[in-house]
């Protein structure tokens, strides 16, 4: 059976939906907690993966650059809070990648094990997730 459903993906500059979530930095109300700032809301597929780790380390290294631009990063993935915290601790304490080490990730990482926020943001499409 053919599915002709059209999925509208979020675009740069569009207003993001509001949500409340638990993060590695405590609870947030998005976007109101970051009022007056540019916001980059991004997702990654899984904690502890090599590519995601290198990307997070790069973001961590660039933290001051984002602050100078009045820009707040917020990450979201399907992993839980305990996994996020362990991964960020591993990045800070154990990973040395291309001369980057001791990188502390200071932006919040949303706990979305239920995939509610990823679907709300159209990062995942719930009709394509097997139950």
Residue ranges and their predicted role:
Residues 1-131:
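Chalcogenol-based redox active-site neighborhoods
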